[in-house]
């Protein structure tokens, strides 16, 4: 199976076409963003969060997919996008602190605790003291996804027998790696990364992590 980066570079055009709207779970959080705020969108993809944000914000989007960022630049030519791997320190070195940080449907693509913790620590570091954040992880234990845990593709994943949270889910003909988080696992990650007073809401499709 391809790496997550290579997968998204292959499916970028088709995937972007399927991500042209704001999920209902996200709308209340985006509606709360004040005009003129500074916003960091971690794993921004094609920049779709901008569809639900005020126009008068200072927005920065990070993503490692050249294909998805091409669509982002096409859709939002005046916006600041950066091509970078968010699991690498260089992606964060020159970034300031932000009033709002969003990280939507990203952390479930990170394969190990080290990368997951690094991402969370960087989000905490780059959030202003009174800032607001929202991260989401797919709820990969929902009924329609359960079949993928024992699919031939998932069972062929390296280390599957060592970590039953690993699974492969197809997008069209391409497989994407996923890490199936649970609420207790996420709570442990957040505490280890230094977060306090956080909330984790479980919906039918997502875990919503916010303050």
Name each model feature, range by range.
Residues 105-109:
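Short catalytic micro-motifs in class I SAM-dependent methyltransferases
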Residues 102:
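A conserved beta-strand element that flanks and buttresses the S-adenosyl-L-methionine
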